[in-house]
Amino acid sequence: MSNSLEFLSFPPLSLLDKIRLGTNIFYASKIKNWRKLENILVEDWLKKWSGNNTFQKIWLPLLKAKLGDAYQKTSAAFIWATIQRMYAARRTGLKKEMFGYVPGGYTRILDSFSKKIENMGVKIKTNYIANHVEQHLNKKISVKFQNEQTGIFDNLILTIPAPIITKICPQLTETEKNKWNNIQYLGVICASVLLKKPLSRYYVTNITEDWVPFTGIIEMSALVDKGKYFNNKSLVYLPKYVSPQDAIFKTSDDDIRHNFINTLQRMHPHLNSDDIMTFKISRAKHVFALPTLNYSEKLPSMKTSIPGLFIINAAHIVNGTLNVNETIQLAERAINKYFG
């Protein structure tokens, strides 16, 4: 469903179901106090407002696509944040979506940002893997890297995921360690596919069928000027959100490619093997911190018990969805609060 007409003609839902669903979405868009949704499971809240049939036909497939079985312990604040973002992308209610992009992608943004801060005298070092963080008697903080080099700092900001924090920061208090260790994550496997021709005219296709091995189809060329930026080719992303312990992280790239492409061709019979120019796979085990019940109350502070050490990562996004905009805003708020 991509517009109001398709929504009204959607066969699996009765007229009453559609009214309840529309009311549910509209009501969620008007809620300002998101914290009151943190103590309600998303399943319970959606069933209350949309009804069981709509939950089974609409909400459950979408929740499982995004969260897997972890939806069962996710709070209603998650769906509130999702609906808020959906409304923010529309100019006039449900009439028109407004999406934008930066020509050149995030590489252009990062290159520009890097040049600016380097001109300010900042040194950027990449491929430095931190193994150990420790504060010394002189209050300086040292970071030991995998390449056996050591950096000494007055202040240090870590942006790494929670499961790594407690491994490299032994001086944190037990309370801090427990809080970080109790954060639950979802990981992602994402295939980037370059095609000779488009799959469809839609930017995002949410998948609700259990037999499909990926959870959505994001076709960038439906949003971006493909003639100008992709040489009239089509760039498609196929993400799959899973637990960090999921067996797919041990599956070979060849097996994932075979499974994903076969499914894509089943969904789009016009797609031939010759149409597939490039197929690349990215993996990340700790991407999205699950907003479990009363999540914001259990979240560790950005300022740690170690003077000068701050931990600021995507787990601190408590009233929004995980995306670049929210991440940048989080960084700006943290910098203004502690270093402004």
Residue ranges and their predicted role:
Residues 1-33:
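Dinucleotide-binding Rossmann-like beta1-alpha1 core, especially the glycine-rich loop
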Residues 20-136:
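Active-site/ligand-binding neighborhood in enzyme catalytic cores
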Residues 50-59, 177-180, 270-277:
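Short, surface-exposed acidic
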Residues 123-125, 151, 277-280, 310:
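General small-molecule cofactor/ligand-binding pocket signal
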Residues 129-236, 240-250, 254, 258-271, ...:
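Mid-domain catalytic core of redox enzymes
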Residues 236-237, 302-320, 326-330:
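Short FAD-binding loop at a beta-strand-to-alpha-helix junction that anchors the flavin cofactor
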Residues 287-297:
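Charged, often glycine-rich, active-site loop that binds/positions anionic groups
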Residues 327-340:
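Internal hydrophobic alpha-helix adjacent to the cofactor/substrate pocket in enzyme cavities
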